[in-house]
Amino acid sequence: MRKLAISVLASLSAVLAGCQDPYSEIKSMAGQTLSEGTVVEGVVISDYASMNMGENPQVSWNEVDIMMSYKTAYIQSENGKAGIRVIFDDIYENRMPRSSKVAIDLAGCSVSVDENGACTVTGIRADDVTVLKDRVAVKPASKRISELKDSDLYTYVTITGVEFINKEGSYTNVNEYVVQASALNDFRKPKNLECIDVAGVYVRDGKGEKIFLPVNTSSYWRRRGDRLPDGVGKVTGILVPADFQRYGNVGKYALRLISNREVDIPMDGSSNYETVAEWNWDRNYKHALNLEDRGLLKWVSGVATPAGRIVPEIGSGALYTTAEATFDLVPDYNTRSVHDGHRPGIGSRKAGALEIDSRTSEWFEGDAAVVVEASTKGFRGKALVLDFTWAAGKGRVDSSFGFPAYWAVEYSLNGVDYTTAADDILLRPIAYEKSPMSYYAAPGYLENSIVLPKSLLGKKKVYLRIRPASDVMVETHEDPSKDINSGVYSPEKSRDFALVIGKLSVKALR
C-alpha cells in the first residue's frame, strides 16, 4: 500500500514544509512527474459528495464525462492564502472528508499550471492520502469581487455585497431536454439527450462588478421550485478560473458552490438596482405583444407579427428594431421547476421571450440594431445599467449559424450620435435537439449586464442600442468542438436569422 504513516510523512514533508511557500514550490514543478518524498499538506475545502466540484468535459456532441467532478477535490493552506486542485484517478478514490487536514503523497503525480497560475495535480489515489486531523475550522476569506486575484484561485472565498442579476427562475434556466438526466428530470420520454452539463447564473455587487456561478446540471438543488433570493448578501464557494466555452467571456474568475446552502442572501430585501424600464414576457398571461401603435396583439403560434415599438411592462419607453423584421413569441426557460411551464419536464414558459426574425444581411450590410428608448428622468445613482438575456436560432441546426458573433452596446442622448460601451458581447445559438450539436451552443439564454455612464441618468430620453460589432459570423462545423466564431460574412451568405430576447431591463445603479 502507498498509504504512509504519519511519522514517515513528517520526514517526507520536509521537502516542501521547509519551503517558505510549499504551494508555490509545487507550481514550480509544472510539467514534471513528481518524485518520491514530495508530500503536501492542506485543508480539504471540497466535498466529494457534491456534484458541482469541477467542470465535466465534453467527450462528444452528445456525451459528457460527468465523472470528472466526482474525481475533483481542492485543498488549501491552513492560512487560506493558497490552494491547489487535485484530481483522483477514479471517483471512488476521492474520499477526502471536507474540513479535514490531510497530507498527500504526490510521488508519480503530474503538475500543471494555467495562465492564471491555478495549479492542478493529477494521478492521485486514495492510498496517497493520510488524514492528519478530522475537523479543522475553515474560515473563508471575505472579499469584494474587485478584490479577487490569481492567488485566490482554488481557495475558499466569501464574496460579499452581491445579488442575483436575474432573479427569475432557478440556478439553471435551461432546456432540460439537452442537459444531464437526474432526479429532477429523469422521468422524461424520450430520455434526455444529456449533451450539455454546466449552466449557471451571475451575481453582482453595488459597483456593477459581476461573477459567474457555474452549476453542473447533475446537481439536484439547482431547480427544485425554490425562487432565487431578492436581497443583497453573500455567497461562498471555491474560486476557479472562468473557462466556459458555451457562455463566452464570463470574466476571469468564477465561484463554484458546493450547494445552494452557501448562498446567504435574504429572500426578500432591497436591491442596489432600481428598474427604469423592463420588457419581460414571463407574466404574459394573455400571450400578446403590446405595441405602441396597435395595442395588445394576441400571439398565434406560427403567425408572425410585423415589427413595431413594444411598450415596456415597467416604466415608459419603447423596444424596437431598425431591421426589416417580424416578431414572434417563443418559450423562455427561466422557470423555478422543471415541471413549470407549458411542457412538463422541459422547464419552459410559453410565449415568454421575443423572437426577432429577419435576414442576416439586415445586420451585416446595413445599420440594423435593437433599440431601446427610456426616460431616466427622476432617477439618480452611480450608473445606468442595461441587462438582457438572449440567444440565436429556433432550436434547429439550420438556424444555428450565419449570424453575427460579436455585438456592441451603444448609448446616445439624441438617437443619432452613439458611443460604444461594450463591443465584445457574444451571441450563441440556442441548443438544438438533433444533429451533432456544437460545443458552443447554449442550453438557455445567456445573461448580459452592461454598465453605462452616470451621465445618462436624469434625462427625458436616452437611447441604447445593440448591434453587430464586426463581420465575424458564426459558422457550423462537422467537428462540434471547433470554434464557431470563425466565419466572415459576405452578401451571398445572407440567410434567415432569429434573434431571441428573453428579458431586457434598464436599471439605475443606486
Model-based region annotation:
Residues N52, N166-Y171, G378-R380, W390-F403:
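Extended, low-complexity, turn-rich repeat/linker tracts enriched in Gly/Pro/Ser/Thr and Asp/Glu
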Residues C19-S69, Q76-S270:
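OB-fold nucleic-acid-binding modules
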Residues R309-R380:
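Surface-exposed, low-complexity/disordered Ser/Thr/Gly/Pro/Asn-rich loops and linkers
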